[in-house]
Amino acid sequence: MTTLPAGALLEGDVRPDADAIVVLLHGASVGESGSTSWCAPAPWRMRWFARAIRVRSRRRIAVLRLRNPDRGWPVVFPRALSDAKEALDHIAGIAPNARVALVGHSNGGRVALSLCSDTRVAAVAALAPWIEDGDRFAGRRGQPVLLMHGALDRRTDPRDTLELAALLRRQGCVVDSETVAGDIHSMLARPRYWHRRVADFVVSQFSSAA
């Protein structure tokens, strides 16, 4: 476990010879009971994606989970974005040649998408991403992006994700976009499907490591 400069925690080991790393970014946990704990709902959801990726890759892809402290709603996105950048800096300092994928849910999806332009980020998966008016996401040509959104999500709008998919395609990203029938923001109606889909996407990007 690594404590990053601003207090976020990064779970998982980074080896200097690591070839492929995925960082999981949870949604906002402001106001949730025990929101600074790994057992709070938002960080806990990402645990199952971590397990699915480890199993699917036969543990050849290093899986890290980032946990953001609860700093209050007004700063939840900018601080989470800063935490993710610190995680990328930490990884680059140990394994500068590693390819990195970001997988984020809700606010974590917004963070992951905001880092598409960072050349250290090889691929992005954004799950039910929180998208605000005025967000300007800039993908890179040829960059793989997975976008998934529950059709019944009432917290974030699946139509925004469809519009984003079209924008990223125009920017040259290789976008795989899906609206998941019957599911909601928590991704708990069809959890195994989400886990499998994300694991398959990540492993396909790092096929030489898997």
Predicted regions mapped to residue ranges:
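C-terminal catalytic histidine-bearing segment of alpha/beta-hydrolase fold enzymes
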Residues: 169-210
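Short beta-strand immediately N-terminal to the catalytic nucleophile in serine-hydrolase-like folds
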Residues: 102-104, 127, 148
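Short beta-strand/loop motif that positions the catalytic acidic residue
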Residues: 141, 146-153
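Alpha/beta-hydrolase active-site loop
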Residues: 74-94
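Short, surface-exposed "cap/lid" segments of acyl-processing enzymes
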Residues: 2-58
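Gly/Ala-rich beta-loop-alpha elbow adjacent to hydrolase catalytic centers
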Residues: 103-108, 112
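A conserved short beta-strand
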Residues: 120-131
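Short alpha-helix in the alpha/beta-hydrolase fold that links the catalytic acid
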Residues: 157-167
